[in-house]
Amino acid sequence: NGIRYALQSTPIQMEGALRHVVTIEKSRLSIPLEKYGIAYSDRQQAVDTFFDSFYGITQSFSTANLTLEQYLQSNRPLVVYGDPGPAKPQMVQMLYAKGPLSNAPLIKIDCAMLMHPGWKYLMASDRSPLMGDGCTLMMSHVEALTDEQFSELFSTIMALHTQERNRLFFVASSSSSGTMHPHYARLVDMLNCLMLQMPPLRSHLQDIPRLSGLYISTLNMRNARAVIGFEPEANLCMTEYSWPGNYDQFCRVLDELVLHTTTPYISVETVRDQLKRE
């Protein structure tokens, strides 16, 4: 609704005991931040978004055998990267929800959507997330910045010590060979970032039957359907496909298959037709 509330707690001694005076400041935002790529959410919203997604439903992160404790314990900036599609923003939301700063906001900054108003707010406003303290920032599409914008943004981060006062996450897409945009190599060096690679679906195709079963059960409840699973040959067809769009494509294909199936088991013909359209 365009209203922002800022809370500040100040410790004081009163009658021999430590008390906290909380002040609440109400202000109206001058621009609609979400329209320009800056969005705020809290821990509960992040948890709900994650567990309502394919990745939360299927627990596909555990399937990928990722060890996350080292990333939770460190305060260093983290680059989460991988092929397009394998759950990078969802991973950040899970790390935020499990991390020590989950009582403060998660601030998502999409550099591809900033445009002039968002960029001006980020770089010049005294309410910029870069000026904050004790928050979690997730920046995506850094490659959309010009070289000049990139230099200005990260010079500002370094000057304000944003990376020391907050937890920074960067979401990056890489090629199948693992190559990322040069901006990410620079920020890794500048900010001494940790790296977390999200494995593509093709690296554990053997898990497709289990993942399919879990997600189909949820789709049945959402859509009042009664699909049990795949015919054996259809299962084989799913595991032999390369899934270039990774989990996002896999999720979309399952949505279509369940929607258009009128029998208890999804046939191999239905699967082949859908994959041809991919």
Which stretches of residues belong to each language-model region?
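Conserved ATPase-coupling elements of RecA-like P-loop NTPase cores
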Residues: 145-153
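Sensory coupling linkers of modular signal transduction proteins
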Residues: 12-62
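Conserved post-Walker A coupling segment in P-loop NTPases
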Residues: 67-143, 200-205
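Per-ARNT-Sim (PAS) sensory domains and their PAS-associated C-terminal
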Residues: 2-5
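Compact sensory input modules in signal-transduction proteins
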Residues: 7-9
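Conserved D-loop-proximal element of ABC-family nucleotide-binding domains
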Residues: 117, 147-148, 181, 206
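Nucleotide-binding/hydrolysis machinery
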Residues: 57-59, 66, 83, 87, ...
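Catalytic acidic motif of RecA-like/P-loop NTPases
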Residues: 143-146, 158
